[in-house]
Amino acid sequence: MLRINWVSAALASSLLWGFIIWVLVDETGSSSEVTRWTGWITSNFTWLYIVTQDVWFIFILYLLGTKYKDVKLGRDDEEPAFDYYEWFSMMFACGIGVGLYTFSVMEPISYYRGAVSKLPIVNDDQRAQQAITLTLFHWGLHGWIPYVLVAMTLGVVCYRHGRPMTIRSAFYPLFGENINGLFGDAIDALSIATTTFGVCTSLGLGVTTIASTMNRLNSDVDPNDDATKILIIWLITAVACTSVILGLKNGIRRLSKITFSIGLILLFGIIVADNPWFLLNSFVQSMGHYVQWVTQLGWDTDTWPASEAIMRDTGAWHYLAWGAKGESGAIARTLSTRGATNLTDTELNTMWGVRTDDGFMNTWTLFYWGWWISWAPFVGMFIARISRGRTVGEVIKGAFIAPVLFGFFYLTVLGSLGIKMERIAELALTTAPADVDWRSGDVNCTNLGYADDGTPTTAGSIQLAKEGYYALSCRPTSSHILDIVEPYGKLSTLFQAMILIAIILYFITSSDSGSYVDDLISAMGYENPPVLQKVYWACTEGALAQALVTSGGLKVVQGVSIVCGLPFTFALNFMVVSLWRALKDEFNDEAQQKTRKGFNTCMLDVLEGYEPETAGANAPDRKTRVVAALKNFIYPFDAIRKAKIAVGTDEKFASINAAVVTGVLWTAIGLLASTKAGAGAHSVAWLFYLILIFCIANIRREVRASRNILGNIMEDYTAAALYPLALAQMEHEAESDPKLA
């Protein structure tokens, strides 16, 4: 018998299978559309991705230094279900996945020999160190933050408050019983979809590396053939499906331990086969470099390279200023043409100095943040599931610090070997200074003796390849990790076979862990869903991975990651507040205990047709609430006036305040509705909308303060964005007390 939340499962399935069908039917159109979505998000929300990661980081570090670190995920007398090795291996295998092998060499080489200048660079040694540091930044503390945040919130709320293990439960301290309706179903559906897209991003990236590794061991395997990649996806999906059917302890736990152990043996085998002292030096230096620069990198939004990209676009100059004549003004007509021409001039580019490619933020940092965030529901819930009996402090240190340090060691070792090989090849093959420009990162692969597909073509490059060395910047990215173990003679084949096994096992652990979490959410936290449900979610992941691989490769995979990460970024912001309230409740915080948990009515009741099971006895009937919301959409005067009077404002000033806010709303609507208004007028309309939000948020704050209702100003601003519902809520609150109405 199925145990499933049909609403959440149907919503998630519709989104996932709708996307799969769309991609398979229209590969070109879907790829183009995903690229357009990605461009819009990166143009408008780069600042949000960057600042939220840093704020979450500060919040988690703060918790580690407070009394809240001693709160246990479970009963106070409960002991952990897994020992440290099992716990760590499952976290690492689930949280890092196949990406560690895909990017550990490819990413540093891309920075080392690419248009990247994020840190001060005066020579090639510093360019090499920058490449390692940027890689650590993308795989470091900022990446694990979303995981830990979700894990702690679910662990505290579910294990100490008896809530089911689903993502909706993380918001219980914030929204109470309202999460049991359609709002909670939507959260779980979003979590399932985000998890599946996030896992399939890794699967889409990993299958290319698997195909390349198989080709290296058996030349009959075509690494570029879609049929080969699809076969790999479904074979591994079948194994992952078997693992998830066996369950957490019998399948996932054992597979994770094997996967982690193989990776450990491979890593130390490579260290011993190479120069361990060089690699240890690189690790220590890279750790110091990371600590030195992580703050600057963490707040970097690529402001100036992005502005230069606009300047290079002759059709985009009007975005730089609001000229009185718009696109017909001097900026658009004259400077656009001349400026774009000047920016292609080598002398001007030299004068501006070494620059970072304007696509760096989209291709790398935002892709990573979207990718980590899209994995957060899945990995965070998985960590919470295996961390029962441990404290908040243990989760932060064990799931935040330990995996990061071990990941740094892995990335530094493999990345350093890649850069060392690149340098050796360049020194051996360079015949003129122009072959390699360390300042810009440009490499002339033809002069170094490589074809477009990365095959050595000259006597020098062929001889170098026989000795196991390649100019990696001229090679296919999927072969980088295989190339760096070529110099080790007879051990090379063994290492490459171990790499293939490790990648496949990481592929499986990511897939089975993702399927397990999808099962858990769709079954409303029931820990042993029927086999049919497990098979369904595993097959959905396989189908989505196939769709991503066949629709446009890495670019589409990266785009989907960024798009999926955005909505869950907003959810994680609310989760921070929810976790904070849950922890304060554990210590019976006096100020929090004396406050009301919410307004008399909830804005989310609209999702239940204004007939929620949690509606109080004093809540207005459905007709009253519908009329109030519709009226406030266009005429907020009465609601604002009542709310201001309810907080003690003089009736005259309350009326003036209501009139001003109503005027702001009508101005915004008028400008947006005007067919003659240009882009500038529409921008002014949005400015008036922001003013409206500011005004309503502050009125809501005053109402909360007068009624001693729990909340904060950020919640008020979020509520004010849906101003008809927020105003109706305040109006009903005022009317509930005749003395203040």
Label each PLM-derived region with a short phrase.
Residues 32-38, 65-84, 109-134, 156-182, ...:
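Flexible loop linkers connecting adjacent transmembrane helices
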Residues 1-7, 41-47, 76-94, 122-141, ...:
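Transmembrane-helix boundary/entry motifs in multi-pass membrane transporters
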Residues 1-127, 245, 577-583:
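N-terminal alpha-helical transmembrane segments of multi-pass membrane transport
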Residues 15, 48-65, 263-274, 406-417, ...:
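Hydrophobic alpha-helical segments of multi-pass membrane transport proteins
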Residues 179-504, 526, 551-553:
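Membrane-embedded translocation segments of transport machinery
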